[in-house]
Structure formats: C-alpha cells, structure tokens
Amino acid sequence: EVGTWRCRLHGAGHIPGAAMVEIETPETRILWSGDIDTRDSPNAGAASPVDCDILCLEGTYGGRHHKPRAEEEARFVARILEVVSRGGTALVPAFASGRGQDILRILHKEVPNLNVHYDGMGTRVTKEWLGCPELIRDADRMVKAFRWSKRVTGKSDRKKALDADVIVTTSGMLDGGPVIWYLNRLRHSGSNAIMLTGYQAEGSGGRKLIEEGKLPIFGTLTPIPLEVDKFNLSNHADHEGLSEFARSCNPKDLILFHATEGGRQPLHTELAEEMTVYLPLNNEPITIIPR
C-alpha cells in the first residue's frame, strides 16, 4: 500500500516470476499486463484476467495466431529425432530465461534417452529460478530436467558437447554467446541442423541466418550450410488470447503497447465496439482521468 493506493501482483504467464501489476486507487483500478501468455507453458501457468477499469495490454501478436502448443512441441521433437537418427547434432539457440528451460522440460519429458547438453547464461539463470520454486509450474520437473541435462562449464565440456544429440545454448537470436562457437564447428557437417524456437528480431544474427544463410562469426560473415527449422514456442498470447483476456478483464478503456502497427490495428478493430481503445506511440504521454 502507498497512501490510498494499493498494488497487487498477478502471474503473467510469460515466464516464472513475470507479473501483471494491478493498481487500485480510490477512483479507479488499472491493470498493467507486461508480457503475458494466456496458455500454460512447461514452466509457467496461464495468466488469469483481473477485473479493472483501465487495461494496459501488450499487443505483440495482435493479428497473428499460434498453432496449438502441443502440436508445435511434437513437431519440434520429431525434427530433433530425425536429425539425431542421421547422426547429426541439433543446435537449439535459446533465450537465457524462459525458452531454454522450456526446451529442457520438453526434451526431458518426450525423449529422455537423448544426450542433451546445456550451455550459456541459461545455466546460471536456471539456478536462480530454482531458488524460487513456488513461481515455477511443477518445479520438481524442472529440477529433474536440469539435473538430467549435461551442463557445460568450461572448454573441455564444450568440446565434448560437439558429440551430443542436442545442444541448448544462448544466445537465442544468435547475436553472441556459446552458440557462435558451436556454429563455427558444426557448420562443416550437413547432418547437423539448427532449430530456432524464438523470435528473431530485424538485424539479429538469427534473422540474417534465415534470410541470407550467413552469420557473422568472430568478425567474418560466414556461410552456414545447415538446415534451419523454425518453431513457434512463443510465451506471448496470440490475437485470440489477447482479445479474450481483454474482454474478461471488462475494462472501460484499453491502452495497447508493445505492438507493431500491423498488430495494433486488428486488436483495435475487434475490441473498439466493446471498450475505448487507445493506440499511443512511443514517448507519447497518457493522462489518466477517472470517469
């Protein structure tokens, strides 16, 4: 509590610990979503709607729809097995907090016989996660998956990992980290493959790999003649999830943020008849006047 204001945190479903912020004043109630997912993922439970007067909602995937998560996870595992069956290594670039841990959970559950190595900042982040088990969905399973993986802690471990079935490592957008070291060595064998499971921003190494088949490696733009597969394992709600979440919060006013113009407009079109929708630009101040 701050004076007559009260603040509460609610699980946002994006990653463990991600929170929506509810601000209750004597005149109005505001909910700030942050990054949210309205579906369960391996390590985080879905965000639940919170009744409010003003909803500030992310629109990352406005106008876009996700395939069912179970379907996409099954496609990911099947592709991993295909690469391993031909004697290759599947390299999975992963974000340090969220995606890497989800990948470990999926692999531990579906293909526990595989030799999976875990490298990069994600190993340290996971240890921090495990210090707050109450925030992790089925925390015991995350503990088991982490212990099951072979953590890379030095150069000798990294060389051993080149013979693994799967390498999960940072960075998720191929802009640095151990993934560059692995790519430089695995690129020489066509039996290996790269599995992209996260968004690749414009200008990132991952985007360059997708569009040009090349990547900067230690200062040199290098061809990467490996198969590159993309999987949508996003921890953001899609258009339908965002729309239903907004309706269930029952706000009078909706403020959309973190969205492209192509994402904001479909949400505006769908929800404008049910609530007042604002589309502010970056650096544009908004004054909230209770009504």
Tell me what each language-model feature is:
Residues G177-L186, S234-S248:
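A short, acidic, amphipathic alpha-helical segment used as a generic capping/interface helix at domain edges
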Residues A246, N250-L256:
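Proline-aspartate-enriched helix->loop->beta-strand connector
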Residues Q265-I288:
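Short acidic, glycine/proline-enriched helix-loop-strand junctions
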Residues R187-P223:
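Redox- and metal-dependent alpha/beta enzyme cores, enriched for Fe-S-associated oxidoreductases
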Residues V77-T197, E202, F257:
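Hard-cation-handling environments
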Residues E1-N115:
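His/Asp/Glu-rich metal-coordinating catalytic cores
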Residues L9-A12, L31-I36, C56-T60, L91-F95, ...:
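Active-site neighborhood of phospho(di)ester-bond hydrolases with catalytic His/Asp-centered motifs
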Residues L57-A74, A139-F146, P223-A237:
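Glycine-rich phosphate-binding "P-loop"
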